[in-house]
Every structure is written in C-alpha cells, then in structure tokens.
UniProtKB/Swiss-Prot annotation:
A UniProt-annotated Pfam family: EFP
HAMAP family cross-referenced by the UniProt entry: EF_P (MF_00141)
Name the UniProt record assigns to this protein: Elongation factor P
Species annotation: Zymomonas mobilis subsp. mobilis (strain ATCC 31821 / ZM4 / CP4)
SUPFAM superfamilies: Nucleic acid-binding proteins (SSF50249), Translation proteins SH3-like domain (SSF50104)
Length: 187
C-alpha cells in the first residue's frame, strides 16, 4: 500500500530502493525556504544497516505489511537457532545474527513472534521482559543508600546490567530485552 511521506510512522515497514526497512525515528521538518519533509531514520531488516532518508510530502513510498506467526525456541546449533511453528509443528533454523543482541536473552522453550515477508522470516521478536538470575554483583558501598545509585551486575547469560544496591548474587530479576536494563525483582 502506497503512503505519502508525511504518513510514515515509527515501526512502519517500508520497501525502499529494493530492500525492506523499518522506520525508527521520524522528524517532521519545515524549513524557511522550500517544502516540508520527513527526516526518517530507517534500519534494513535483512542486513541491519541504518540510513537517514528525506521524504517530501508529495513523495510516496510502499508500506509493507508483515505476517506474524507464533513460534517456540527449541535449541541452538552453532550459529543457527531452531524454532518450531506452534500451529504446524514445522521446524525452521535461522542465523543468530537475525536476533542481534537479544539472542543472549533467548531461553529454551521461549515463545517468540516471527515476522514473515512472502513466507520468509525477517525478524524474531522476543517477549519485552525476561527473567534472569544475577551471578555476580558488586558489594554495596556504605553510605550510598541515600541516593538512587545503581551498581553493575552480571546475569546468568553473561549480560552486564545496572541494578539497585539491594540486589545480590542469586537474585532473580526482570530485564527489559530491548534496553537491557533492570526492571524489577522477580516474584
């Protein structure tokens, strides 16, 4: 479906110069001279490249709708990850690169949402928050309790996060997958 430059919104998938791009940041600019345009920061869904493109309000671009399917993560085999379609029980293997930094939070049996374009997997969306265990945390320095200071800690998957002073090794916490930040203590 074709949309004009001013109708582009964050999260839209656009077909641009032969590739699929996800619009990330968008800024409407109206210079003193000349017509208004949308400055769009986009990320290529295939290779991860980022680019900035100006779309004039009169320009049109193809907005693509991706199909989504529920999958379950099964196992890793080298650089490949294997998922199972929850409806048909078919298995599909994808490269780890497709998940980027989020691959560290992938857990056996985790339910994920796969985005498909013309039946080909484009991206894998993990749950927004996952539970992880602290394996190492710095000790609290006396007198730091008055301010909201955070200390570094290492999770069971090797990811380093900043946590409140009361969190110790062995504590289970909830982590935001996208920002890789501490959310709260797990119940």
């Amino acid at each position: 479906m074709k949309i004009s430059g001013v109708d582009i919104r964050p999260g839209n998938i656009l077909e641009y110069e032969g590739g699929l791009w996800r619009a990330a940041k968008i800024q409407h600019t109206q210079p003193g001279k000349g017509g208004a345009y949308m400055q769009v920061e986009m990320k290529n869904l295939i290779d991860g490249r980022k680019t900035n493109v100006r779309f004039r309000s009169a320009e049109t671009v193809e907005r693509v709708r991706l199909d989504t399917k529920d999958f379950q993560y099964l196992f890793a085999d080298g650089d490949m990850l294997t998922f199972m379609d929850k409806e048909t029980y078919e298995q599909i293997s994808l490269p780890k690169d497709l998940l980027g930094d989020a691959v560290a939070f992938l857990q056996d049996g985790m339910d994920v949402v796969m985005e498909l374009y013309e039946e080909k997997p484009i991206s894998v969306q993990l749950p927004e928050q996952v539970e992880a265990e602290i394996v190492e945390a710095d000790a609290v320095v006396k007198g730091q309790t008055a301010s909201s200071s955070y200390k570094p800690a290492i999770l069971d998957n090797g990811v380093r996060v900043m946590v409140p002073p009361h969190i110790t090794a062995g504590t289970r916490i909830i982590v935001d997958v996208n920002t890789q930040e501490y959310v709260k203590r797990a119940d």
